[in-house]
A protein has these predicted regions:
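Bacterial N-terminal signal peptides
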Residues: 7-18
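N-terminal carbohydrate-binding accessory modules
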Residues: 23-73, 88, 294
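Active-site region of glycoside hydrolase catalytic domains
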Residues: 26, 135-278, 285, 289-309, ...
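Acidic (Asp/Glu)-rich catalytic clusters
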Residues: 31-37, 59-68, 100-107, 145-153, ...
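A cross-family glycoside hydrolase active-site/sugar-binding cleft signature
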Residues: 44-46, 73-77, 113-117, 159-161, ...
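Acidic-and-aromatic substrate-binding clefts and catalytic sites of carbohydrate-active enzymes
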Residues: 48-56, 79-93, 135, 164-169, ...
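An active-site-proximal structural segment forming one wall of the substrate-binding cleft
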Residues: 53-56, 61-70, 76, 90-116, ...
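Aromatic-rich peripheral "rim/lid" segments of glycoside hydrolase catalytic domains that contact
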Residues: 312-368
Length: 368
């Protein structure tokens, strides 16, 4: 099959979006415009703090900055900076890694969001002992705030907790307390937070914004999952058996028909049902409309802080088309976006050369 040109992919992305161009929604005053601009296009640097040896090369960071990315989301594994799960010496070492990463990124001209990234041990504590979890979050943010206070407050932002894995009512109560605590430590810092349930767009309508005006609200987007997570790394996951599924997903596409036949022959009814549920695809604008409606109601800024497609099984032209569609929609809504992620399975860097994938960058940035 001939490779589609990037121009064709951009044109297809425009067709996939059923919304028409519109003016940016009016927002309440609170987050300075220069910070919203800094958050407008970025990438996650996953793994850097978990293993500083895996830090992205400075040359890659420089190239991405030159291409136009302005924001790095820096996940900090919660289990590594909480005294319930880590000794003081380990916590101090992780905080030094955060400080070093901030120095590097700020020198290169990025703005950075520090993301307290929940893990299995913290998630279990969060469900079983909410007061204990709150104490750990406050301890983690006390340490992180000490690091952040060494750097410009208008370029380093605080993301309260990635993908809270508790029910909506619990998190709604906790987020007010946690945000107030962090605001006491970082009076001028922009905060970032979002809803439960993987921070899906359709979970945002059940989330009440904070009284604090200097907050950006983050959603994550991976729909349809059967496309974005095909060839899943876990062999026990049904999506492990999906590969070559195109986007958009149409019943009359020969590739979809062939995949359905393969899954039937393999005796994979659960996986087959996941493919069938994605036919016909709803379209990016329809998946994200609940978040747009929430913004129209509350007038707060939104960022798509994670989105991406696993490269292992997705057709390249479809991956580029999906990425272009997501960021085109974000631009129409005047939302920021942060691609997941830089150098791993969803990565923006080429696995062989370690250099930026130029076509993926053009798809994200909407340039030719």
């Amino acid at each position: 099959m001939a490779r589609l040109s990037i121009a064709v992919i951009f044109a297809a992305a425009s067709v996939l979006l059923s919304v028409t161009a519109r003016a940016c929604p009016a927002l309440i005053e609170g987050v300075p415009p220069d910070r919203l601009k800094a958050l407008s296009q970025g990438v996650n640097a996953d793994g850097w703090i978990a293993d500083p040896r895996s830090a992205p090369p400075r040359s890659l960071l420089r190239e991405l900055r030159k291409a136009g990315l302005s924001h790095i989301r820096l996940p900090v594994p919660a289990d590594f900076v909480m005294p319930r799960f880590a000794a003081k010496a380990e916590i101090d070492g992780r905080l030094r890694s955060v400080d070093a990463a901030l120095k590097t990124l700020l020198e290169l001209g990025y703005s950075v969001s520090i993301d307290l990234h929940s893990g299995e041990r913290f998630n279990a504590l969060h469900k079983d002992d909410p007061p204990g979890a709150m104490a750990e979050m406050k301890s983690a943010w006390t340490g992180l705030a000490r690091v952040m206070q060494r750097h410009p407050y208008d370029r380093v932002f605080a993301e309260l907790l990635n993908e809270p894995d508790v029910d909506a009512a619990q998190w709604q109560n906790e987020v007010r307390e946690l945000a107030g605590f962090i605001r006491g430590l970082l009076p001028q810092t922009t905060l970032i937070t979002g809803p439960v349930n993987w921070q899906r767009a359709d979970s945002l309508p059940d989330f009440t914004p904070l009284d604090d005006p200097n907050v950006v609200y983050a959603i994550h987007f991976y729909d349809p999952m059967v496309f974005t997570h095909q060839a899943h790394w876990d062999p026990n996951e049904p999506l492990h058996d999906v590969s070559g599924l195109p986007y958009p997903i149409r019943a009359d596409d020969p590739r979809v028909q062939q995949l359905r036949e393969q899954l039937t022959a393999l005796g994979k009814p659960k996986t087959l049902a996941m493919v069938d549920r994605a036919i016909p695809d709803r379209g990016i604008d329809q998946w994200l409309e609940p978040a747009a409606a929430w913004q129209r109601q509350y007038s707060h800024p939104i960022i798509i802080n994670e989105f991406g497609v696993l490269k292992a099984g997705a057709p390249r032209d479809s991956r580029l088309r999906w990425l272009a569609g997501v960021t085109a929609y974000a631009r129409q809504q005047c939302w920021g976006w942060t691609h997941w992620e830089m150098s791993q399975g969803f990565g923006l860097a080429d696995a062989v050369t370690g250099k930026p994938d130029r076509e993926a960058l053009r798809a994200l940035l909407g340039t030719r």
